[in-house]
């Protein structure tokens, strides 16, 4: 999982889902799990 300042680019990729957990923003991608990231 990458920790990014901005997850804007990752959320545009196919299969990406934006999820809020514990006050942090996560991007989960089941199609391509390499694009997993957290902001904050």
Curated annotation (Swiss-Prot):
Name which cysteines form disulfide bonds. Answer: none
What is the annotated signal peptide range for this record? none
Q: Name one GO cellular component term.
A: ribonucleoprotein complex
Q: Which GO terms describe its molecular function?
A: structural constituent of ribosome
**Organism superkingdom:** Bacteria
Q: Which UniProt keywords apply?
A: Ribonucleoprotein, Ribosomal protein
Kindly list the biological process annotations in GO that this record carries: translation
The record's SUPFAM superfamilies line, in alphabetical order, gives: Ribosomal protein L36 (SSF57840)
The similarity annotation says: Belongs to the bacterial ribosomal protein bL36 family.
Name of the protein this chain belongs to = Large ribosomal subunit protein bL36B
Give the organism the record lists: Clavibacter michiganensis subsp. michiganensis (strain NCPPB 382)
**Corresponding gene?**
rpmJ2
